Regions:
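Conserved beta-strand/loop subsegment of P-loop NTPase cores
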Residues: 29-35, 53-65, 84-88
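Switch II of P-loop NTPase G domains
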Residues: 2-29, 35-51, 68-74, 158-164, ...
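Walker A (P-loop) phosphate-binding loop of P-loop NTPases
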Residues: 94, 134, 145
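Switch I (effector-binding) loop of TRAFAC-class P-loop GTPase G-domains
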Residues: 13-16, 119-122, 145-172
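Active-site phosphate-binding and catalytic loops of NTP-dependent enzymes
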Residues: 11, 18, 39-42, 109-117, ...
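Glycine-rich phosphate-binding P-loop
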Residues: 127-142
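Canonical P-loop GTPase G-domain recognition
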Residues: 65-130
Length: 197
């Protein structure tokens, strides 16, 4: 499948991104990938599939209210056929995010059970949050934290340092790990299209 985006990844960006993701993958239990539902494939990091491999992952197709409903459904089916869990949402309003933590709990059920048997019930599940600028990653983290943990703005890459965010759902603790500094070269027209509504 294809969409209409035009994002260029240069060797320097690729190297930096790969290093950041590889470092964080070692300390997390799963990956949360934020994309723009209007251009889901173009708003993905192209090296993520190779890096994540067998690590549990969920894609949040953000800004779903601005996307074509039929196209979103087809993209959701496309990713699910590849074994990736998908939720549609709007991170700024919170629409659809009530399903996120229950979905993560289901996705990591085996890990939760193993920890329970080891007496590690209170150990937080660690989730790495990834997404290129302007897909709504900061809005997602702020919404989950119920407070403003990260800066939200139109300038690409406003989140530059690793940020840790604690959240909880039905007694289960979650630690969101946001790796900053991932800045591809985004076409100006596409960037304007992707900016927060």
């Amino acid at each position: 499948m294809n969409d209409v985006g035009n994002i260029q990844w240069f060797p320097g960006h690729m190297t930096k991104t790969k290093r950041l993701i590889e470092a964080d993958l070692k300390m997390v239990d799963a990956v949360v990938e934020i994309t723009d539902a209007r251009i889901p494939e173009s708003s993905r990091n192209p090296i993520l599939d190779d890096l994540v491999k067998d690590k549990p992952r969920i894609i949040l197709m953000n800004k779903c209210d601005y996307a074509d409903e039929n196209a979103t459904r087809l993209w959701k089916q496309y990713y699910e056929k590849r074994g990736i869990r998908v939720l549609t949402c709007d991170c700024r309003s919170g629409k659809g995010l009530n399903r996120f933590l229950p979905e993560v709990k289901t996705m990591l059920a085996d890990l939760i059970e193993r920890r329970k048997k080891r007496g590690m019930i209170g150990k937080a599940l660690r989730l790495m949050v990834v997404g290129i600028p302007n897909v709504g990653k900061s809005s997602f983290i702020n919404r989950m934290a119920k407070t403003k943990k990260t800066k939200v703005g139109d300038k690409p890459g406003v989140t530059r340092d690793r940020i840790f965010c604690d959240c909880e759902w039905c007694g289960h603790k979650f630690l969101l790990v946001d790796t900053g500094g991932i800045e591809p070269n985004i076409d100006d027209g596409l960037l304007a299209h992707m900016r927060e509504q």
